[in-house]
């Protein structure tokens, strides 16, 4: 996360804005606003507050008081009901000792405030560092796979439903909206996306294990201290969905480096995952198509954010949709990029691992 704006609580500098054209602060907070929020959540005496560049959807601030550091989020998209569902899920996960953010209560016992018609929450700051994808080693990836499987297992005990805002039908609807307004120079991209939707409509398997998924396991949503995973953040996209889709999204986000899928990274992530939850044969069979749908989902939603978001240009934070469009081309075998080894691992994954478990030890 990158510093955007800062204000000191004790006679320091006034609020300033740095390169706001690229920063995701949709709801600006003054020192007075922050002071009221700190008071309402009983966080202690304000020392400093910093607007954070993190994600493209919501507004975030890091607050420092004499009691420690806290993370403030203003939900710019979700309804109050949807925001409450996210809070409820986080509370459930914390009870199961899952390393996610901890929502805090206000003085009146609520876990959120209404701020200008939007849901505002405060969580404890998770210590550690967000590592760029090229700094993640096999130990990090193994830990991430293990944590994702743990989330999927813990999610079995969470019986409340959370609608999937990024399921296939929803992405189709978003694409139809976007497609009508795309500039003509993207016609080749439109052709590929049209074809991909036609393919996935026929070949996506909906009869796969489902449960609570994170939906957005990117490097900037995870913190480490050394090789130890300290926390998983940003449950904005969490919902009930296919578990293999969640793992496929993690592969797309974590195992793609220098324009190629890396089999060593893939094996480290999958190995960590399967120590807790071995994949079924149908999941292995569906893995390539779930990778394709994940790449398609992020291509479409990033195009939408870029071309259709109704916000002043100075408030936008741009994420290049072509990053995932390029992955999609590789997954479609229209471009080279390391998929041969990964596809082979998927094709033999179930039988190979079954053999390894049954093989007598020497």
State what each model feature region is.
Residues 56-64, 71-72, 103-104, 198-245, ...:
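Active-site acidic catalytic loop and adjacent metal/ATP-binding pocket
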Residues 177, 298-362:
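ATP/Mg2+ or Mg2+-diphosphate-binding catalytic cores
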Residues 29-40, 159-160, 173-215, 225:
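An alpha-helical support segment within catalytic cores of ATP-dependent transferases
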Residues 134-187, 208-210:
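A cross-family kinase active-site recognition segment
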Residues 65-158:
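ATP-binding pocket architecture of kinase catalytic cores
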Residues 244-278, 294-310:
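Active-site activation/catalytic loop segments of kinase-like enzymes and analogous catalytic loops
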Residues 2-7, 11-107, 225-228, 346-362:
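Conserved NTP-binding catalytic cores of kinases and kinase-like/nucleotidyltransferase enzymes
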